[in-house]
UniProtKB/Swiss-Prot annotation:
Family: Belongs to the universal ribosomal protein uL14 family.
GO molecular function: large ribosomal subunit rRNA binding; structural constituent of ribosome
Function: Binds to 23S rRNA. Forms part of two intersubunit bridges in the 70S ribosome.
Pfam families: Ribosomal_L14 (PF00238)
Superkingdom classification of source: Bacteria
Organism placement in taxonomy: Bacteria, Pseudomonadati, Thermodesulfobacteriota, Desulfobacteria, Desulfobacterales
UniProt entry keywords in alphabetical sequence: Ribonucleoprotein, Ribosomal protein, RNA-binding, rRNA-binding
CDD domains, per database record: Ribosomal_uL14
A GO term from the CC aspect: cytosolic large ribosomal subunit
Name the record gives this protein: Large ribosomal subunit protein uL14
Amino acid sequence: MIQTETRLTVADNSGAKELYCIKVLGGSKRRYAGIGDVIVVSVKEAIPNAKVKKGDVVKAVIVRTKKEVSRPDGSMIRFDDNSAVIINASNEPIGTRIFGPVARELRAKRFMKIISLAPEVL
């Protein structure tokens, strides 16, 4: 569960290291975002000569959360960190690599490019 002012790590090679959630997209009073949801973030920390700079406001999709997610078969999955992948206006990732596992819930939300780049889908 990600809400406004949450800090997230970045799971791609766009050059950003830390993100800060500004807004959860999908309704004016929506408070929480989970895996596969799109949020508006600010880049709080970035490496030099990166595709994004510190202070940039971009969109990102959440790929891992510490809060567990229930699956239809009754199982649950949770991760060790809150991570997101920076995306462009057409919901394609800016980076060319994804680091760490991502959740299977991204497939239902139509983020196929992220699924194909990820080293492991849990």
